[in-house]
Amino acid sequence: QNHSLDYFLPEDVSYNSEIPKPSKVLGFVPGDWHISHDKLVQYMYTLAEASDRIQIENRGFTYEKRPLILLSVSSQKNLARLDEIKRKRQVLTDSQLNNADFDNLPVVVNQGFSVHGNEPSGANAAVVLAYYLAAAEGKSIENLLNQTVILLDPSFNPDGIQRFAHWTNSNRSTNVNPDPIDREFYETWPGGRTNHYWFDLNRDWLPVQLPESQARIKTFYEWRPNILTDHHEMGSNSTFFFQPGIPQRTNPLTPKLNQDLTEKIGNFHASALDSIGSLYYSKESFDDFYYGKGSTFPDVNGSIGILFEQGSSRGHARDTQNGVLRFPFTIRNQVEASFSTIKGSIAHRVEFLEYFRDYYTMVSDEAKKASTKAYLLGGHDDYTRTIALLDVLHQHKVSIRPLTENVEMQGKVFKANEAFVLLTE
């Protein structure tokens, strides 16, 4: 089926003709082919050069030396005061200094795509989302940009996206074949799910052992976004999932208000998908438990993590129990979920900011009431392991102090400058 860029975009919106459409740079409309990471980067830099709504940065490189780019998207006024916005947000995490002025504080939405490289609708949707944010005109987009700072991470897994796009595009027929036994759907091992070292990056938000994760975590703590989205795919016979997940499988450390706010924004997802006639479900199939995943890590940091799962076309079109599932359709659903996230974040901006502030006040109060006031780390057996642990803790902004004198506890001697103290307050 032929489609145009309009297939993905809201109706009755005009666009700045000076902002290049994806097809002008990529050579195809999103969904006709799978975007490779090099083309994705090329388009994002082209957008940033053409638009005064976008700032782009490279936060490092993958093992295969692909850039880990991040787009900051907002109004010109907000972009000019990003450092000020960051400082005000950091104040909210200090229970002694948290009387912030919410009237002038935008909500921060971190939108991340395709941490599993062979779940490509997310990264391809990021292209459409970026174009809309850069080119749309009118009061609606102006209001959106004034009230939000969008951190757009178009590819959580550049090496995996590149690997999968190469396979799928190389095996695409001129006339797309939806037969599930077609070669296009049998990606060779190790596949695009993982990074260069075949590690599942959606398990690394806590261990932070890999460059992709380290860049993400640095961005997270620099901004501490109110919402972080994690766009995935699932089996081809499925429809579309958005959180909350299974209520009984939510981590007990996650506040109930977190799940209530997740459900509030879920109403916006439902409305958006209803408007285009797409099927969806929630509160089933997926948990919200392990904090080392992209959709749950924010939940223990005063943010709202949201998982999206789109039934995958795997290639360009695939026969399923529900009929032929085409790649552009999967992209469209991810785009709609991106729009609805932003719309919901604006509608509940003050609630998200209040929750963010109150979360850190609650954590501080809990620490004061706790019987354990400090932890002793290291000082014996394996100093190298101690240093490795300290590196992880430092990346998570956990304050550690070296012992200034020897301490003996439970028959063990913890030596000065070889052991460390982690205070709970």
Where are these regions (language model features)?
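Aromatic- and acidic-residue-enriched carbohydrate-binding clefts of CAZyme catalytic domains
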Residues: 180-199
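Intrinsic-disorder/low-complexity accessory segments
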Residues: 1-120, 124-151, 197, 203-204, ...
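Active-site-proximal loop/turn and secondary-structure-junction residues that shape catalytic pockets
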Residues: 156-158, 233-235, 312
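Aromatic- and acidic-residue-enriched segments that line the glycan-binding/catalytic groove
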Residues: 162-178
